[in-house]
Amino acid sequence: MKEQNKNSAAVNELNTVPFKTKALPYCIVAPALIITIGIMIPFAMAIFYSLTNYSFRMPDYSMVWFRNWITILQSATFWKAILVTIKYAFFCIVLEMGLGMGIAILLNNLNNAFSKAMKVALIFPLMIAPVTATIIWQLMLSSSVGIVEKFLNLFGVYGFPWAASPDTAMLTVVMIDVWVNTPFCMLLILAGLQSLPKSPFESAKIDGGSTWFNFRNLTLPMLKPAMYIALLFRLMAALQEYAIVFSLTKGGPGDTLMNLSLTAYQTGFTFQKFGFALPYILVLWFVINKIAKFIVGKQRAAQRLAAGLEE
């Protein structure tokens, strides 16, 4: 009897709770649930259509199961797209991270009016769309009116092929990407530098530590969390690069710059083989997902190490 009274009291107490209080947990969870559903439904549809022969020209389609995947994995086009994607991402990341770190260290050490003016100037490429940046560089590299071409003429170099030659096309798009995205790496690394605690460096100075010793054993380990964040964002973007390459060469000359994104676009929208194009995108997603998990793990480990050094 007492147990029933307790249960009744608990039910009555629950019924007296205001509706807003009861609804609050559901309201908090709802946005995350909606976003998750919004992500999973297109992803599930992509997997499904990759197993079909779906085409925009023919609304009727049938299941081909893994035929698309097998054909693509046996195709030289796929493996060349993989190679182009990796090469492009590698060159971009090495240059952007290296230049971004060098510029960030320079600006952090200057810390004066010149440094502030440089920050404003360096942020400019981030303020324009990649397509706009590509158009600007097309004008700068033009053989007739380009300022870069005029500069090369001073050294006796005329008609440099830039994006017109398979030998220099990769160099050209990487150069534009580096110009556009190095400021992003610089800003993140500079923010990391300016957030470093001063006490470990003061202790090292008292102990007679050299500049190189401090950089290698203090600055770099404590800066790694910020560097991993910059690496993660830039690597994901470089692996799925589309705008700069398409705007400049549309993947040419020939198929020189046909990475996974452009190959998927060409297969799906130019050749109208939508089901055949999706495996390219899903492979790219899988690669980016695995790399992102690896970098996030490294970033967390670096955070723990940095916390230990700060103490």
Language-model features and meaning:
Residues 17-311:
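A structural signal for multi-pass alpha-helical bundles of membrane permease subunits
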